[in-house]
């Protein structure tokens, strides 16, 4: 296969592909042209010759199985290694000598081309060109003509940035699909490596390339000005911008000033219509080779311009996909809409499922209630029954007999305690003392008034509101006297006491007054006997002391004590013993944890703990005008001096340390006079002598 010839000799035949063959080869059932054009014009009716009729080939021919006729034929030696496959077994293109190609180029500019250009390059060509300009500036490589074999990917041209064949510095790969001109490749340095490789099947015209250092022009080119490149005389006023500034297309004869021709046919356009993505030229030359774009347009990598609104719209408008590169990931609106609708549907299904579940549950419960049995109703009635009253309430109401060691406090007893507290507060004027009792504050009053426990039975002796609860054998004629005695002792001007007295006479919860319960009367203990003896001796000592001092003291002779008064005195005596026991218990318990007792802290104005559950404790002291014997209760119930000695008595008087001031509010219970600073209370000194005996009697309990 030679290159195309304008004309063939008179004794030759011109093939359809431009190839010339001898006239004798025409219509010989062999494809010498390569495109079967020498056999298509023949109108032979006879069958092609068989292999048995094949004649030997001449010396300047070779035997080959034709690719077109599928029969053996004789081909000329000139068809071997011509780049065209004539034999079916590729025998005419095998073991061909490859011409030497490639060159080392060291100038600022130059040209190179493929082997046999503009003829077909030999099959299997393998050439390498090394361009080293010796300058650090870029090298511009331009392919003015490029045509490779289009039968496959076998023929290619690889361009590297530098002289080494480094895959990481590969600038571009050109194949038969890039068969258009011009093609421009720019390196980052002054060195480029160009490698051309062709397969052994078929061939093409090849390529022609030029190179130059950036800023220099070839001898036959005209500079565009500055670093805008160069153009040739043939490119002048051809309607195609070869210079970015359009210098090769300006001031053309067929256009006015500042206008550019669309082509050589005389149509022109202004600069403002250049590269605005609107074709003003019939051939669209005003939108080709755009180095810059008008405002509002996007410049593509292939030197085209598109609208900026078309960038990142999921459509390739540039043609090379450059308008869709580096776009942010945006979820489409239809995807969001589908997600919202799906969520609503799922929520609706969930609501329906919950509604069905509740409905099934209600139906199930209704069905279960419809099959309710008698036993289930009985169980429900048992579960809904009211809780029975407590054991203490039954004992207080008199429905059941009391049990030993079971603490019982009836409403009448509670009223007695309240009367005691109110009477001491209103008549005697003692300040209430708040004792922080921590965990024992809830039952301190029960311990005070239930202290006198029977040694034999172990039950507590309760303070009764009525005298007949203690001694049921007393006659009814003494009832007014007892009531009078109580009124004189507890003369409290409050409605609560009257209401409480009236309530004791009213009917109980069961429709009447509760029947009196049998109470165990404890025998006279050693403590009571000792307290009585101490009281009588204290009275005699007090009288003797007054006589020695020579003071005019009016003695009050106590009247004879009736049995009712004796009972009340016994009750108050037991209450006094209970208060003393509390004092003793508090002093003993506090001595383990701290050196100073809670009573000493109270006397010094220091409280042990700021607890919310404090007990308000009153210190009752009977008045001297009482009409019964109070000798047993002459000492203060919480006498701090008996436990702490004389050291605790000093804070009571700042002027006279040796005399203990009387904190009484009224006449003395022993002598009947009002003690002041001029009239010292000598009764207290007599009381101090009996403190030791009282403490010993208290320890017997």
Swiss-Prot record:
Q: Which GO terms describe its biological process?
A: endocytosis
Segments passing through the bilayer: 335-355
Q: Name one Pfam family in it.
A: CUB
Keywords attached to this entry? Coated pit, Disulfide bond, Endocytosis, Glycoprotein, Membrane, Receptor, Repeat, Transmembrane, Transmembrane helix
Q: Fetch the Gene3D superfamilies from UniProt.
A: Low-density Lipoprotein Receptor, Spermadhesin, CUB domain
Please give the residue ranges the record annotates as the region Disordered: 465-520, 535-565, 590-612, 643-665
Q: Could you give one GO CC term from the UniProt record? A: clathrin-coated pit
Here the disulfide bonds are 8-20, 15-33, 27-42, 57-74, 64-87, 81-96, 101-127, 217-230, 224-243, 237-252, 255-268, 262-281, 275-290, 293-305, 300-318, 312-327
Q: Where is the CUB domain?
A: 101-214
Q: Which PROSITE patterns is this protein grouped with? A: CUB, LDLRA_1, LDLRA_2
* Subcellular localization, as worded in the UniProt entry: Membrane; Membrane, Coated pit
Ranges in the topological domain labelled Extracellular: 1-334
Q: Which InterPro entries match?
A: CUB_dom, LDL_receptor-like_sf, LDLR, LDLR_class-A_CS, LDrepeatLR_classA_rpt, Sperma_CUB_dom_sf
Domain of life of the source: Eukaryota
Q: Which of the residues are on side Cytoplasmic? A: 356-701
Q: What is its main location?
A: membrane
Q: How does it assemble?
A: May interact with RACK1, ZFYVE9 and NMRK2.
Q: Give the protein's function.
A: Probable receptor, which may be involved in the internalization of lipophilic molecules and/or signal transduction. May act as a tumor suppressor.
Q: Which family does it belong to?
A: Belongs to the LDLR family.
Q: What's this protein's name?
A: Low-density lipoprotein receptor-related protein 12
